[in-house]
């Protein structure tokens, strides 16, 4: 399966193919001339796939060095980025060379940020190995690192030269890590794909989580939602905000819990349920939709709440949200399953959305 992210200045393909990891050398050779490559990966994923990827790249003539960092959201910071910049410089990486991200969302965000800022920008590729990264963060060009104030506070818009998705690598994910990715899948269904919602409704949790039943179709449909939105609104000024359903509160949960304690997809699930509950009470979403969302979230083992729920700390984190404009935050609501809408909320009104 192949999707084309047809952006005017930087179009690229997203390849979805079982066993694709075995053909990385051929794929990269089709996109880049022989050059130096820095492979960026965390210690866990690098241990699983790093040497195989390096061997294939070297076999077709690339010179490769691997920058490895400690697994987890806590590593997505300025210190890790600086270490990566220095590593690239010591390896002699120039603007004609490239960076490959091999890993989950943290790796993709970090590697993309490093690539977009090193020497004012060099080429990079995404090889996502988590469900969250495959269906969401590897596509669209958002890169970033966290600060103590907010998630992804420092970042760029920089598109990759290509994305290679191998669903087979999901077999090495732990169940929590796989379920976390379903938070983003459920979001895609809610904002833009009712057929995907129906597919998730019909699937049993065991068939999907343990057997990866229908996983290629689920990845493809989720990527197609992301592709359409990114092509329509590359820089996040309009409809691309729909992809942030559940993220305003979700990012605040991640920040206040301490990065890594609540996984991103888990926080998105919590955020979708919480904002829907209050929006439904305000008459902005149809009666009963929150229960539908909560039922779907819980079906796949995702949380629908978080403790301790500290409204003051969450509100403080929300004030640094990237969707804020002045004293207004553009939140996302779902008028019906398969559609999304922007709902502008003042900071003061946002306090209502944090009430349990």
Swiss-Prot record:
Its EC number is 4.2.3.4. The keyword Membrane does not apply. It catalyses: 7-phospho-2-dehydro-3-deoxy-D-arabino-heptonate = 3-dehydroquinate + phosphate. InterPro entries: Dehydroquinate_synthase, DHQ_synth_AroB, DHQ_synth_fam, DHQS/DOIS_N, DHQS_C. Zn(2+) binds at residues 184, 247, 264. NAD(+) binds at residues 71-76, 105-109, 129-130, 142, 151. It holds the Pfam family DHQS_C. PANTHER family: 3-DEHYDROQUINATE SYNTHASE, 3-DEHYDROQUINATE SYNTHASE, CHLOROPLASTIC. This is 3-dehydroquinate synthase. The lineage of its organism: Bacteria, Bacillati, Bacillota, Bacilli, Lactobacillales. The gene is aroB.
């Amino acid at each position: 399966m192949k999707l084309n992210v047809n952006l005017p200045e930087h179009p690229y393909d997203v390849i979805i193919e079982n066993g694709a990891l075995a053909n990385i050398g051929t794929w990269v050779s089709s996109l880049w001339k022989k050059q130096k490559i820095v492979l960026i990966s965390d210690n866990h994923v690098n241990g699983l796939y790093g040497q195989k990827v390096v061997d294939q790249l070297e076999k077709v003539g690339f010179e490769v060095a691997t920058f490895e960092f400690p697994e987890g959201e806590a590593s997505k910071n300025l210190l890790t980025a600086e270490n990566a910049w220095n590593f690239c410089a010591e390896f002699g990486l120039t603007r004609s060379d490239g960076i490959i991200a091999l890993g989950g969302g943290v790796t993709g965000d970090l590697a993309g940020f490093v690539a977009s800022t090193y020497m004012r920008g060099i080429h990079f590729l995404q090889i996502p190995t988590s469900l969250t990264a495959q269906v969401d963060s590897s596509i669209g060009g958002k890169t970033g690192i966290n600060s103590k104030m907010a998630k992804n506070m420092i970042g760029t818009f920089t598109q990759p030269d290509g994305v290679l998705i191998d669903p087979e690598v999901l077999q090495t994910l732990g169940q929590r890590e796989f379920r976390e990715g379903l938070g983003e899948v459920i979001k895609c269904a809610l904002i833009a794909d009712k057929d995907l919602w129906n597919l998730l409704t019909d699937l049993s949790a065991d068939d999907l989580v343990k057997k990866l039943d229908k996983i290629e179709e689920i990845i493809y449909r989720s990527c197609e939602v992301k592709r359409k939105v990114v092509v329509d609104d590359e820089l996040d000024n309009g409809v691309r905000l729909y992809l942030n359903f559940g993220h305003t509160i979700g990012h605040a949960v991640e920040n206040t819990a301490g990065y890594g304690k609540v996984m991103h997809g888990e926080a998105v699930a919590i955020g979708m349920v919480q904002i829907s509950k209050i929006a439904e009470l305000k008459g902005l979403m149809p009666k009963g939709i929150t229960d539908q969302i909560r039922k779907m979230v819980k079906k796949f083992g995702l949380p629908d709440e978080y403790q301790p729920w500290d409204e003051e700390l969450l509100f403080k984190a929300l004030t640094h949200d990237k969707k804020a404009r002045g004293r207004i935050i553009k939140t996302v609501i779902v008028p019906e399953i398969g559609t999304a809408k922007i709902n502008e909320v003042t900071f003061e009104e946002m306090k209502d959305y944090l009430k349990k």
